[in-house]
Structure formats: C-alpha cells, structure tokens
Design a protein with these regions (language model features):
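A short glycine-rich, Lys/Arg-flanked "PGG" loop and its adjoining helix->strand segment in the class I
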Residues: 107-119
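C-terminal alpha-helical "lid/dimerization" subdomain adjacent to the S-adenosyl-L-methionine
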Residues: 125-166, 170-180
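Class I SAM-dependent methyltransferase SAM/SAH-binding core
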Residues: 34-36, 40-80
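Short conserved loop adjoining the S-adenosyl-L-methionine
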Residues: 81-86
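Conserved class I S-adenosyl-L-methionine
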Residues: 25-33
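Hydrophobic adenine-recognition pocket in adenosine-nucleotide-binding enzymes
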Residues: 97
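Conserved alpha-helix/loop element of class I SAM-dependent methyltransferases that forms part
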Residues: 7-24
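A conserved beta-strand element that flanks and buttresses the S-adenosyl-L-methionine
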Residues: 93
Length: 184
C-alpha cells in the first residue's frame, strides 16, 4: 500500500479521476484492490460508490478503511455478477488494472463493463504507458523493473483494443503525466 502511494502516482491519479468523474453519482471501480484510488470519492456524500476486485484480502482491507462511509461498498466479485444483478453506473473506472491482463481479457472486461454503463455514462481508463527515451531514469526504473503488470501497452494499443475488439469509438483520449513520488 505504501509502495503504491509513494511510487505509483496515486495522488495524481486521484486528481485526474476526480476531474473526469466530477458530477457522476453512481461510480464503479473495477479492480479497486484496497481502495487507494477509491478515496477520491470519500468526501462526496452524493456519490454511491461500489468497488470490486477478485482479491478477497484486498476487499476486506478496503471495507475496513471505508467502514464509516455508508455510501461506499466493496465486493469480492467479477463483472458477470453485476451484470446478472442488472446494475447500472454513471461512471466506471479502470485504474491501473488492464496492464495486468491479456489483450483478450482486457477486451472482455471492457465489453462487460460497457453493459453496466447507464445512458450518457462514462468509462475512465487510467493505465501506465511504457517508458520512452525522453523520460528520466526514475520513470524508466519504475517502468522496466518495478511495474508488476506484464502487459503494459502503448496508447495506440489500448485504442486498438477499444476500437477493434469492442467496435467502439473513443470520444476523448489524453496522456497525463503523473508524479512517481508523493512529494512532487
């Protein structure tokens, strides 16, 4: 948890996510783990938040962290479970999880999540991109040695998954640089 906060750019991710999901009231975070990014919505009383993950230990920890917040729920489940419950969300968030799965699994997760999206809803995907020559040594070290995901993709590769596998159009795509350190 501490490692992720210090080197994973959690603070900047929260700012980016808050910017794009501001005004949405039913939020689903897929792959929420222990709730690092979920804290973005902690002080928004009008938000109904559900975080899901397949890691039961992480979900139990998230439940403890958010025990005083009635508008927060965490479940150990998969997307198919939510679809069978006919749940709908205004905002769906993938925060640094797709680089841990294959292209076909990422496509499947995105396709399933689109079935949970309410009309005029939005899906936000925040993923690390491979380090480039222009990046400093810290970014390269993190990207090449410390990043645990085995499927870090380029922006174009993510766009191809969305457009080719899902047959969807991307309404907006942007690259935001996030700090690797909490004190920057």
């Amino acid at each position: 948890l501490l490692f992720q906060c210090l080197l994973g750019g959690t603070i900047d991710k929260r700012k980016i996510i808050a910017k794009h999901l501001s005004g949405y009231t039913k939020i689903l975070e897929i792959g929420c783990s222990s709730g690092n990014v979920s804290t973005t919505f902690r002080n928004l009383k009008d938000v109904e938040f559900l975080g899901i993950d397949i890691d039961d230990v992480a979900i139990k920890y998230a439940e403890k962290r958010f025990s005083g917040y009635n508008n927060f729920n965490f479940r150990c489940c998969n997307l198919e479970d939510l679809i069978s419950e006919k749940k709908k969300f205004d905002g769906i968030l993938f925060a640094s999880i797709l680089h841990h799965v294959s292209d076909s699994e990422a496509g499947k997760m995105l396709q399933l999540s689109s079935r949970l999206l309410s009309e005029n809803g939005i899906i936000i995907i925040s993923e690390p991109l491979p380090a480039e020559k222009k990046h400093n040594w810290i970014v390269k070290l993190y990207s090449n040695l410390l990043e645990q995901g085995s499927n870090v993709r380029t922006q174009k590769e993510y766009e191809d998954i969305i457009e080719n596998i899902l047959n969807l159009k991307i309404s907006k795509s942007e690259i935001e640089t996030i700090s690797s350190f909490v004190w920057n």
